[in-house]
Design a protein with these regions (language model features):
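N-terminal secretory/membrane targeting signals
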Residues: 1-25
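Buried, small/hydrophobic-residue-enriched core segments of structured protein domains
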Residues: 26-73, 161-163, 176-415
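N-terminal, Lys/Arg-enriched amphipathic/low-complexity engagement segments
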Residues: 56-141, 311
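Exposed loop/turn and edge beta-strand positions of beta-sandwich/beta-sheet ligand-binding modules
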Residues: 136, 167, 183
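Short, solvent-exposed loop/turn positions at domain surfaces
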Residues: 136-142, 159-162, 371
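Short, well-structured beta-strand-loop connectors
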Residues: 142-156
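Short coil-to-beta-strand transition motifs
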Residues: 162-170
Length: 415
């Protein structure tokens, strides 16, 4: 927190200085003393006006040149945190941080360990309801008993046929589940033991135009991995985002450890950032976690083609919406994109290998004996296969985090 109104500050100081003079003037018949006091008052008011204008101009120029925020005290006066001497972790390298004073420390039992396991999963699904803005009944291009490769198109959006949704695994389409009014709820695939991928011809990121990259993301099925704010929908391909935001950490309970997620995916992450940097008229912004004793992975802190911003505070400091508000809030008529750390990696993998690979790290926590850990799996994995034979009759399963996830059964699939 810093003094926002320098005029008020100077006015207070002026009052403290002038009050004795006024008292003297009132108690004295000497007109010279009264005139002197009035001159001092006028001078201090003039100084206050000059300081106020200077402070406002300084803030405007700082914002114009992109040097405001991120913990920088762009002001004529020291911030209260400067005066109190509060320290940020040394790994922030003096870059400052957004410090969120409010929030909640949500301590729940059953936190996942940092161990990573791989569990065999037989069934996977793509759920149209996971994608906001899509038509309630998308156009299927497959039927039950069809064989598909990982990356083959399953359906597309009727309102925009260029936006395609692909299979996360290779295997057989065993069921197309429908809900109310025949809306499709799940397209279920029985996975092959050995995965097979559709291989795409990948454009050169350095040489490709923005339009060429957009077309490739649409054709390859990666486009739905991106969200458009302020309404959190699958983006309109015709719009260019003002900025792109990625929160590299989550402060929600049981969230996966970002260092575990990035481990082994460093090149894919950087490649994903390189792609995204060509899709915006502004910048790619990365929110970094400054709450821990040790620094995040250097793949996150030393990333190229993106601006990094440190955040300190309780939940929801890891929420991308909170970070957008502090870094560069959305103005009227603007749209920005957001992605998760793991979706950036998936985009990068495509440009490195040509394969639609939506492998991911999830965490399982809570009152489930012996299962609290991280797991390597693929998007849309069956929840029952992941949990195995755990006794969950009297327990509630949540797909997603505890605060914003949905109640799910063992026969359902990860979002």
């Amino acid at each position: 927190m810093r003094y926002k109104n320098s005029f008020s500050l100077v006015a207070i100081l002026a009052t403290m200085i002038i009050s004795p003079q006024v008292l003297i003037a009132q108690s004295s018949s000497n007109n010279v003393t009264l005139i002197g006091a009035l001159i001092i008052i006028g001078a201090l008011i003039l100084v206050a006006a000059v300081v106020t204008v200077s402070e406002n101009l300084l803030q405007i120029e700082a914002k114009k040149h992109g040097i405001s925020g991120n913990g920088r005290n762009v002001s004529l006066f020291p911030s209260l945190s400067d005066l109190s001497g509060s320290k940020l972790p040394s790994y922030t390298q003096g870059k400052g941080a957004y410090v969120l004073k409010k929030g909640y420390e949500i301590n729940l039992t059953g936190k996942p360990s940092d161990e990573v396991f791989k569990k065999p999963v037989n069934r996977y699904a793509v759920r149209p309801t996971n994608f906001r803005g899509i038509a309630p009944i998308p156009k299927l291009v497959i039927s039950e008993k069809d064989e598909v490769l990982a990356g083959d198109v399953l359906f597309y959006d009727k309102s925009n046929e260029n936006i395609k949704y692909c299979s996360p695994v290779s295997g057989e389409i065993v069921e197309v589940r429908r809900g109310a009014k025949r809306a499709i709820t799940d397209v279920i695939i029985l996975a092959d033991k050995k995965q097979k991928y559709r291989v795409n011809k990948v454009p050169d990121v350095n040489k490709a135009s923005r339009e060429g990259l957009v077309d490739f993301l649409l054709e390859s099925g990666l486009w739905p991995l991106i969200n458009e704010r302020p309404f959190d929908v699958v983006p309109d391909p015709s719009k260019i985002p003002s900025n792109i935001f990625i929160s590299t950490f989550s402060t929600a309970p049981y969230a996966p450890n970002a260092d575990i997620v990035i481990d082994g995916n460093e090149d894919a992450f950087q490649k994903g950032i390189d792609v995204l940097a060509k899709l915006t008229s502004g910048d790619v912004h990365l929110g970094l976690d400054a709450n821990k004793n040790s620094a995040p992975s250097s793949s996150l802190t030393d990333v190229k083609n993106a601006k990094t911003h440190w955040f300190v505070g309780k939940h929801p400091s890891g929420n991308v919406g909170v970070q957008i508000h502090h870094i560069s809030s959305i103005k009227a008529g603007q749209s920005v994109w957001t992605l998760t750390l793991q979706n950036v990696i998936s985009i990068g993998r495509m440009f490195l290998t040509g394969k639609y690979d939506v492998s991911k790290i999830i965490s399982i926590g809570g009152a489930i004996e012996g299962k609290q850990a991280h797991y390597s799996t693929v998007s849309g994995a069956n929840i029952g296969d992941l949990l195995g034979n755990s006794d969950l009759d009297e327990k509630r399963i949540i797909s997603g985090d505890v605060l914003t996830g949905r109640t799910a059964g063992k026969g359902e699939f990860l979002d």
